[in-house]
Amino acid sequence: ARRSLRIYYKGANNQEGGMESDLNYDLFGGLAKDRNGQAITSFSRLLLRNSGQDSYLSGFRDAYMQRVSAGLCVDTMASSAALVFINGEFWGVYNFRERYSPEYVSDHTGANKDTVTVIENDANNLNNPNPDVAFVDGSGVAGYADEFNWLLEFADTHDLSVPKNFAWIESKLDLDSLIDLCAVRVFFNATDWPENNIKLWRDTAPDSADARWHFVLSDTDWGMGMKQTTGPERNLLFILLNYSNGTYTKDCPLTRLLHALRANRTFDEKLIARLWSLPGYLNADRLNEELDQMVAEREPLMGLQADRWPKDNLS
C-alpha cells in the first residue's frame, strides 16, 4: 500500500561523529523559513505524505492549502513533490512535508527543541455522541495537555467579557493563530474540523520569550469540496460559530472556546475582520498562480503513478 512514511535522521542517538545527523539540503526551495525569513536547509524530521484521503484525487490538496496560507499567523508545513523508490522499486509520487514536532518549532522560532511540547485533540473520543474531545500529548515534553484542558475549562466557566479573565486567556494563548486557523479553514471549507485535526505547541522553558499555546494548520484534506458532503453548500462558518438556546451546532472544545472568546468585543471584531479580509490575501490571482505551479510540478509524474497504482485512479 502507498502509505505515508515518517523519516527520522538519527545516526547514533541522532548524532554522528559528534554532530546531529540531519538532511542538509534546501528541500522546499526556500518555502520553509526561520524567524529571520531565511530558508531552513537542515532537517531531522520529515514526512513523506500520500495526501491522506485526497491521495486518489488531486494528491496535493492539503499541501496546496498550506502553501497559499504561509505568511499568516497560523503555522503551516512546507511541501515539495517527490518520487519515492523503496529498495530500488518505484513506489509512487508523494509530498515531502515538514512535520509538526519540537524540531519544527525549533527550526522556525529558535526555541530549544528539548523544551517544546506538541499536543493534539484525542481522536479516540470523536465517536462519542456528545463529544468532549480532550487534548493529549503528541510529541516533545510530555504532561502539558492537561494544562491546555484546564485553560479550556477556565474559558468555559468564566465570563471573558471581564477584562482580567480575557487578559489571562490572552497571556496563555496565541489568539492571532486561532483567528487565522479559523479563517483559513472556513475559507477553504476544510471540514473534519473543528472537532478534529487540532494541534498546538508551546515552549515550556521557564525563561521562554513566548510561552503561549500556538495553533497550527493540520490535515485539510477534506477542504475545497473533496467530499460530496463538504461542498460549497456546507456552511462551516455557521457550524463553527452558531450557538443558540444553550446548544452548539457542533459541541466540541474549539466551538466552546470561540463562543467564550467572542464575549470579548475586541476579539469578536478582530475575528470578523479577519474572516472578511482573508479573501483579499487569498485572492484568485494568488491561488491560481500557486495551483498552476504545483500542477506543473506533478503533472509529468502522474503517468508513472497510474502505472504503479492502477486501482488508485490518478494518484
Which role does the model predict for each range below?
Residues 1-131:
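Conserved ATP-binding subdomain of kinase catalytic cores across diverse folds
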Residues 1, 15-19, 54, 71, ...:
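Middle-to-C-terminal accessory/interaction subdomains
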